[in-house]
Curated annotation (Swiss-Prot):
It is a single-pass type I membrane protein. It is found in: Virion membrane; Host apical cell membrane. Binds to sialic acid-containing receptors on the cell surface, bringing about the attachment of the virus particle to the cell. This attachment induces virion internalization either through clathrin-dependent endocytosis or through clathrin- and caveolin-independent pathway. Plays a major role in the determination of host range restriction and virulence. Class I viral fusion protein. Responsible for penetration of the virus into the cell cytoplasm by mediating the fusion of the membrane of the endocytosed virus particle with the endosomal membrane. Keywords: Clathrin- and caveolin-independent endocytosis of virus by host, Clathrin-mediated endocytosis of virus by host, Disulfide bond, Fusion of virus membrane with host endosomal membrane, Fusion of virus membrane with host membrane, Glycoprotein, Hemagglutinin, Host cell membrane, Host membrane, Host-virus interaction, Lipoprotein, Membrane, Palmitate, Signal, Transmembrane, Transmembrane helix, Viral attachment to host cell, Viral envelope protein, Viral penetration into host cytoplasm, Virion, Virus endocytosis by host, Virus entry into host cell. It comes from Influenza A virus (strain A/Chicken/Hong Kong/31.2/2002 H5N1 genotype X1). Residues 1-16 form the signal peptide. This is Hemagglutinin. The gene is HA. Palmitoylated. In natural infection, inactive HA is matured into HA1 and HA2 outside the cell by one or more trypsin-like, arginine-specific endoprotease secreted by the bronchial epithelial cells. One identified protease that may be involved in this process is secreted in lungs by club cells.
Length: 567
């Protein structure tokens, strides 16, 4: 009878109603890195590093780039005869120049403050070319004879289209005094130059005067140039050199020229009609007849990700450049399906749901929730309130991280612009150093936040567990695996009250108390039964052993193997 009671009690315990707290799992293979671990598989992750581009030059927000093809910026602005297709250009979004364009300064020489001029162009989107000193106005000088075989056009000697090389006329070079007043509302880009002859004979042949000068003045510029006569190696068939200069003439300001020789005078100037974000990109790519919001020298990027690792130079609404190969933010939970039965590792910030052995693939409508079983059946149900709060929290965290890192990189970007102007030789090293630091910061922040996110999910599971535990109290038993075993019958309505936090503890406490006491009594009774059986077994075993020893002794005495003496 006692055995039957014990068996029934055990069966009753096995079939008790249960509710378990757990978390979502799926078939995801997405992995993230944390401070403590690498390649942690998670249910959801967000890649924040763009690695792809289209390999083409594209329009930027519908505006075409100015692709200089085989011409350099200097060749375009001065008017190299081989760059006639760029005499008048429409508005551009950015400028593309090859690394070594063939059509640069056709007459050998130098362009003063060339990098500074390029920097200026990175803030301009449109020029309008205007004539400021007509070529025909030089009546006392030869304005058409200043040509060179170094600048051919249609097989004949020619010269830059936008400046005039003035030569002596009738064996005389009268002193030039010319002024131009900028009556426009826009700034003007004005270019001029000086010719450095090969020897004194060339000097007098071209300009008559053996000693010459060029003076240029504005409200902000005071320049005096003299030719440097020297024997030089030939470049493009020329031993002479030309040096070009530029300035920005503000509205209502005037530029004054004075010279008695070697003067390369401006004919055209560029009215800056539109300023804005632009760039000069070194690229060999072809135009792709496409549109983008972000362009790099490697190709266009069309992405909403906050970072990319394609090229540090960009134009448009672009992700921020880092040197990383991988930046992935965890947005979901550790993906540990229950069937794997792997022990969860605790994180740096104290993961506290490690007692739950695995996630549920059957729960698909939330991150955290319940699994119940009773006489009416079993099933999964997500806790939507905690899931939504977690989603909002993770989303806000991701956005905060992105905004935080964007602000840092924008600040560095402005510093790089200043370095490019002032410390050109150190710019590359400084740029690499800053990028190394900010890349490290971005990677470290992602690792830290991934650790926090995973522990945040663990904490949410533990909070849900505590919510149930505080409701049930001693009406149920904690099984240690995230589950509770009821001491009373809990139908679907009862289960629902536990899930939504309205469980009525007093309603079930009496039934739970009786069942708890009955189970405790069965345990005590079964323990007493086992103690009696144990004593009986011990006595019986000892008696059987004594009988065997006595029988063996009598047998040995009867056959003489053992001598028995009775005193």
């Amino acid at each position: 009878m006692e055995k039957i009671v014990l068996l029934l009690a055990i069966v009753s315990l096995v079939k008790s109603d249960q509710i378990c707290i757990g978390y979502h799992a799926n078939n995801s293979t997405e992995q993230v890195d944390t401070i403590m671990e690498k390649n942690v598989t998670v249910t959801h992750a967000q890649d924040i590093l763009e690695k792809t581009h289209n390999g083409k030059l594209s329009d930027l927000d519908g505006v075409k780039p100015l692709i200089l093809r085989d011409c350099s910026v200097a060749g375009w602005l001065l008017g190299n005869p081989m760059c006639d297709e760029f005499i008048n250009v429409p508005e551009w979004s950015y400028i593309v120049e090859k690394a070594n364009p063939a059509n640069d300064l056709c007459y050998p020489g130098d362009f003063n403050d060339y990098e500074e001029l390029k920097h200026l162009l990175s803030r301009i989107n449109h020029f309008e070319k205007i004539q400021i000193i007509p070529k025909s106005s030089w009546s006392n000088h030869e304005a058409s004879s200043g040509v060179s075989s170094a600048c051919p056009y249609n097989g004949k000697s020619s010269f830059f289209r936008n400046v005039v090389w003035l030569i002596k006329k009738d064996s005389a070079y009268p002193t030039i005094k010319r002024s131009y007043n900028n009556t426009n509302q826009e700034d003007l880009l004005i270019l001029w130059g000086i010719h450095h002859p090969n020897d004194a004979a060339e000097q007098t042949k071209l300009y008559q005067n053996p000693t010459t000068y060029i003076s240029v003045g504005t409200s902000t510029l005071n320049q005096r140039l003299v030719p440097k006569i020297a024997t030089r190696s030939k470049v493009n068939g020329q031993s002479g050199r030309m040096e070009f200069f530029w300035t920005i003439l503000k509205p209502n300001d005037a530029i004054n020229f004075e010279s008695n020789g070697n003067f390369i005078a401006p004919e055209y100037a560029y009215k800056i009609v539109k300023k804005g974000d632009s760039a000069i990109m070194k690229s060999e790519l072809e135009y792709g007849n496409c549109n983008t919001k972000c362009q790099t020298p490697m190709g266009a990027i069309n992405s909403s990700m906050p970072f990319h690792n394609i090229h540090p130079l960009t134009i448009g609404e672009c992700p921020k450049y880092v040197k990383s190969n991988r930046l992935v933010l965890a947005t979901g939970l550790r993906n540990t399906p229950q069937r794997e039965r792997r022990r969860k590792k605790r994180g740096l910030f104290g993961a506290i749901a490690g007692f739950i052995e695995g996630g549920w693939q059957g729960m698909v409508d939330g991150w955290y929730g319940y699994h119940h079983s009773n006489e009416q059946g079993s099933g999964y149900a997500a806790d939507k309130e905690s899931t939504q709060k977690a989603i909002d929290g993770v989303t806000n965290k991701v956005n905060s991280i992105i905004n935080k890192m964007n602000t840092q990189f924008e600040a560095v970007g402005r510093e790089f612009n200043n370095l490019e102007r002032r410390i050109e030789n150190l710019n590359k090293k400084m740029e690499d150093g800053f990028l190394d630091v900010w890349t490290y910061n971005a990677e470290l922040l992602v690792l830290m936040e991934n650790e926090r996110t995973l522990d945040f999910h663990d904490s949410n599971v533990k909070n849900l567990y505590d919510k149930v535990r505080l409701q049930l109290r001693d009406n149920a038993k904690e099984l240690g695996n995230g589950c509770f075993e009821f001491y009373h019958k809990c139908d679907n309505e009862c289960m629902e009250s536990v899930k939504n936090g309205t469980y009525d503890y007093p309603q079930y406490s009496e039934e739970a108390r009786l069942n708890r006491e009955e189970i405790s009594g069965v345990k005590l009774e079964s323990m007493g039964t086992y103690q009696i059986l144990s004593i009986y077994s011990t006595v019986a075993s000892s008696l059987a052993l004594a009988i065997m020893v006595a029988g063996l002794s009598l047998w040995m005495c009867s056959n003489g193997s053992l001598q028995c003496r009775i005193c």
